[in-house]
């Protein structure tokens, strides 16, 4: 795995060991960021959250492209170690926060401009993300929620709007606008 574009383009990303995570492939990440850039233009100055962060690849990609700050939420110890290792390798500690907790039970915080979520593939996981993000107030008005689910699983946007969906291999990428 590697960073696709921006300040750290081509830099490797360490993936967590074991079967507990399913890292987003370079191809899927490239498709997702292409979809986002065509809509938002730039990540400059954005506050970003990376839920079910795994290796932190989505949040690190956003940082590489100019995001001001990324909060990583993950509860798997091996994934947390990989995230911290990747942050250290990129010398990005001053622009990040790592929250060792479950993304399924988010505590209220200042809203983010962009929220990435890559929950485990399971029936209803995308809908659960929409509900948790909405209840905790994690998405700013006009912000974006990007969710990766299994290809056969559509995501209901709740009070928000689905802006785009795309299938990439076994994955479905859903962009939701607040």
Q: Where would I find each of the regions flagged by the language model?
A:
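Class I S-adenosyl-L-methionine-dependent methyltransferase catalytic core
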Residues: 1-178
